[in-house]
Structure formats: structure tokens, C-alpha cells
From Swiss-Prot:
Catalytic activity reported: uridine(2552) in 23S rRNA + S-adenosyl-L-methionine = 2'-O-methyluridine(2552) in 23S rRNA + S-adenosyl-L-homocysteine + H(+)
One Pfam family hit: FtsJ
Organism this protein belongs to: Stenotrophomonas maltophilia (strain R551-3)
The protein's name in its UniProt record: Ribosomal RNA large subunit methyltransferase E
An example Gene Ontology CC term for this record: cytoplasm
Length: 210
């Protein structure tokens, strides 16, 4: 118990001294994750006016907030999450599990006949702290996001997803390379150094898989 207490105290100290946490609080952003996305979007110039962007696993809303901030009043930001999320100006939120047909039908009705330019996924499982449990759960969510992009992202579009390095990671990246003209692995500055998370970016979705 003492070890857990020390670990919790260390996490809290690190969290509140984190410059990205302070920046998020100062700028009214919902999470420090917004700055991971900011770096990724700007590095690869992923956003343009009038784009349609889908944010999977959107709660608490930092990524959707960042996208809306960057594209201004143009385009659409559609956010989905199994967790509820307080409203965000300029963001269309659907509360539900996109694996369910009813939720998927609602999403498709929201989307109408507009093509999706960019699919984002910052989804992650609730961590148990046991890698042998967490990694398969993470890869399962990643497969769901990849399947979603297969079915809803336009040809030529881009897909950005958070992954944990570990079992299944290399196979997943290979699967992405079959689907996209260019695949890059990124570790933004706002990612904590000890974290296994990286971001995989697929650009130029192919009409047909290799």
C-alpha cells in the first residue's frame, strides 16, 4: 500500500508540474492530449479548411477542441465516444459504441453523403497496469478504428491513431502500409517519455488494399 501511495504521489507531482497540463489549464483546453495532436497536425499539415474530421474515443474532448480551433468555422468535426462528453462549440458529438449497428446508423445519418477527410483515434483501454492484459486490449481498439477508417474514410484521406508499442504493433503497422501510400510513426513532445504510446499516421488511403 505504501508503494502505491508513493507512486500516486509521484504521479500527482509530475502531473501538476507538467508544462502541457499548465498550458491546457491556461488556454481552456480539456486535456494535455490536445498538444500532442497540435504537433502531429502541424508537422504533417493534415488540416485544411472545409475538411470533415471524425474523432474516435473523443472524450473529454481535447482532440476535437484542437481540430475545431485549427479549422476555424469551416468544415465539420464529428466526435464519437462510449463515454459521455460535455458539449463543445462546433463539435457534433455522438454518445455510444460505434460497434453497435444503431450507433453506426446514427453516425452515418449525421454524416449524410459527405466524404470523411481525416479519421483520428486516441482510444485506449482502462489500464490494469499489466502489459499482457493492456496490450491486447489496445490492439483490439486499434483494429476497430482501422476497420472504421476502411469503411468511412475517403480514398486519399488520412488516418491518425494512438498505439502502444508491444505485441501486435509491427503487424498492425504492416496492415496500415497495405492501405495507405505513406505510413509514419510519431512520438510528439507532449507524450511522456516513459509511455509506450506512439502515433501511427497513414496518408493517402488507397482505393484497394495491397
Amino acid at each position: 500500500m505504501a508503494t502505491r501511495s508513493k507512486s500516486s504521489q509521484r504521479w500527482l507531482k509530475e502531473h501538476f508540474s507538467d508544462p502541457f497540463v499548465k498550458k491546457a489549464q491556461a488556454e481552456g483546453m480539456r486535456s494535455r492530449a490536445a498538444y500532442k495532436l497540435e504537433e502531429l497536425l502541424e508537422r504533417d499539415r493534415l488540416l485544411k479548411p472545409h475538411m470533415v474530421v471524425v474523432d474516435l474515443g473523443a472524450a473529454p474532448g481535447g482532440w476535437s477542441q484542437q481540430v475545431r480551433r485549427q479549422i476555424g468555422d469551416t468544415g465539420r468535426v464529428l466526435a464519437l465516444d462510449i463515454l459521455d462528453m460535455p458539449p463543445l462549440a462546433g463539435v457534433e458529438f455522438l454518445h455510444g459504441d460505434f460497434r453497435e449497428e444503431t450507433v453506426l446508423s446514427q453516425f452515418e445519418a449525421m454524416l449524410g453523403d459527405q466524404p470523411v477527410d481525416l479519421v483520428l483515434s486516441d482510444m485506449a483501454p482502462n489500464k490494469s497496469g499489466v502489459g499482457a492484459v493492456d496490450q491486447p486490449r489496445m490492439m483490439h481498439l486499434a483494429e476497430l478504428a482501422l476497420d472504421f477508417a476502411d469503411n468511412h474514410l475517403k480514398t486519399g484521406g488520412a488516418f491518425l491513431i494512438k498505439l502502444f508499442q508491444g505485441e501486435g504493433f509491427d503487424d498492425y503497422v504492416r496492415d496500415m502500409r497495405r492501405r495507405y501510400d505513406k505510413v509514419s510513426i510519431r512520438k510528439p513532445e507532449a507524450s511522456r517519455k516513459r509511455s509506450p504510446e506512439v502515433y501511427a499516421l497513414g496518408q493517402g488511403k488507397r482505393a484497394h488494399m495491397k
